[in-house]
Amino acid sequence: MRLVVATRGSKLSMLQTEELLAQIKAVEPSIEFEIKIVKTTGDEVQDKPLYQIGVKGIFEKEVNLAVLRGEADVAVHSLKDLPSELSPGLVLAGFSKRAPPFDAVVSTAGYVLETLPRGALVGTSSVRRAEFVKAIRPDVRVEPLRGNVDTRINKILQGKYDAAIMAVAGIYRLYGASPPIKLAVLRPEVLPPPPGQGIVAAVVREADSWLIDLLKKASDPKASLEAIAEREFLKAVGAGCHVAIGGVAFARNDTVEFIAGYASGGRKYIVRVVGDDPVEVGRRAAEEIRKFKDGDV
């Protein structure tokens, strides 16, 4: 059996793809893979913050099109890059074991948010990260920082930024336990990550039931529960990348804990929801966040 797998061509994308394919291989050793590299809008446009590009799914649209057109069987993504609704005919069908979902302050000096010097230049092109940083440290400067993980880290090493806010997962996947820079991990109560961060996801055609079954067997159970809760949150909260909303689920034993947050106008709000149904937990967290977003609280 041979599967054609569509993915982006960055080093991190390839590592994530290999990680998910190894899980599939573990349950179906005879399977073979052919990798199809796809360029996306997000790869091509590097001179604008993501929220200014004005295209939904800038890191996933072209990759998923390869599956819809029959050019590939599986599309592999960082789950955080997928919009709340996929194109008709496509379904989410598989999830990797989760890397740490948190964001971190990345710097050469080992700064935490509280120890950043007044007026420090902090890089991020994420509205969510920028608004939370401004709410916590209104005395620092926040400016856009685009590029792959290596590019952003190199700009910090070169002294162009005092620090950046980046995903722990991407750094650990690229460098393992010894990155070339210091990380101060941010608890989700301080800066909640985007839904899906740290999980690699597979998208397939809805009609390919045999492949859906295979990917379900290959999926990490804990990550699957967390993904279900976070996707429900994303769908119910009804906000895109231009709104500073984050949320992360933690599946433990028979319960799911959800921590979500919203930041705007120099203020941040955090909610915590616990339950045994991941869909309901994600929906309840979204309802609480919408009260702040819509000005009801």
Swiss-Prot record:
Stored InterPro entries: HemC, Porphobilin_deaminase_cofac_BS, Porphobilin_deaminase_N, Porphobilinogen_deaminase_C, Porphobilinogen_deaminase_C_sf
Record-listed E.C. numbers: 2.5.1.61
Gene Ontology CC annotation, any one: cytoplasm
Keywords: Porphyrin biosynthesis, Transferase
Domain of life from the UniProt record: Archaea
Free-text comment on the cofactor: Binds 1 dipyrromethane group covalently.
Pathway assignment: Porphyrin-containing compound metabolism; protoporphyrin-IX biosynthesis; coproporphyrinogen-III from 5-aminolevulinate: step 2/4
An example Gene Ontology biological process: protoporphyrinogen IX biosynthetic process
Family named by the database record: Belongs to the HMBS family.
Note: The porphobilinogen subunits are added to the dipyrromethane group.
This protein's name: Probable porphobilinogen deaminase
High-level lineage: Archaea, Thermoproteota, Thermoprotei, Thermoproteales, Thermoproteaceae
Gene for this chain: hemC
